[in-house]
Amino acid sequence: MSEGKVRVKVCGTTTLPDALHAAAAGADALGFIFAPGSKRRVTASQARGISLNVGPSVARIGVFMGQSLDEVLRTAEAARVSAVQLHGPLPGVYVAAVAGYYPVLRVLGPEELQAGNVQAATVQATPGVTLMLDAPQPGSGQPLDWAALVPHFPPGSWLAGGLGPDNVAQAIATLRPAGVDAVSRLEASPGLKNPQAVEAFIDAVKRS
């Protein structure tokens, strides 16, 4: 990543047209959700088909929540993802094990970023793992209190949680994340993107 560039991840990708559009609009990464119960969940086969058509220039990130280590690694390989995003309460050894195979975005909530929190410190000290801050309920569309998080937000971390075309520039100006991730505010309906919102979001990030 070039100095100062904020990377853009369009998460909850479920269709090839949406993936191709996001890539053409300038997305750096696409997110495929494999977490049980998600309205945006895809199979490894679906994600693989999209990944192979989009090509290697755009990162493909598999999103998991509370799944076994074996399931994460098997699904990631079958889907041909290039990185893994991990949600939920997980031991450090689990995260480190995944990081032995793939770059990891480890998602934590605001309360876990407080000074002295063991999880946040462990994430920052684990090779191949980057912290991502998200809302307690991912995909809810509710933004975080960015100003309150300034003292706790580690440099080099990613930001998610209620980001959209209308507020991402302010979020970037406040926290200076290495990357931003959006889902619900880029959709026409769960799992289906609003092309204009995707373009506006990416443009707002690139201009920040």
Swiss-Prot record:
GO terms for molecular function: phosphoribosylanthranilate isomerase activity. Keywords: Amino-acid biosynthesis, Aromatic amino acid biosynthesis, Isomerase, Tryptophan biosynthesis. InterPro entries: Aldolase_TIM, PRAI_dom, RibuloseP-bd_barrel, TrpF_fam. Pathway: Amino-acid biosynthesis; L-tryptophan biosynthesis; L-tryptophan from chorismate: step 3/5. GO terms for biological process: L-tryptophan biosynthetic process. It comes from Deinococcus radiodurans (strain ATCC 13939 / DSM 20539 / JCM 16871 / CCUG 27074 / LMG 4051 / NBRC 15346 / NCIMB 9279 / VKM B-1422 / R1). Belongs to the TrpF family. The gene is trpF. This is N-(5'-phosphoribosyl)anthranilate isomerase. Its EC number is 5.3.1.24. It catalyses: N-(5-phospho-beta-D-ribosyl)anthranilate = 1-(2-carboxyphenylamino)-1-deoxy-D-ribulose 5-phosphate. The keyword Amino-acid biosynthesis applies.
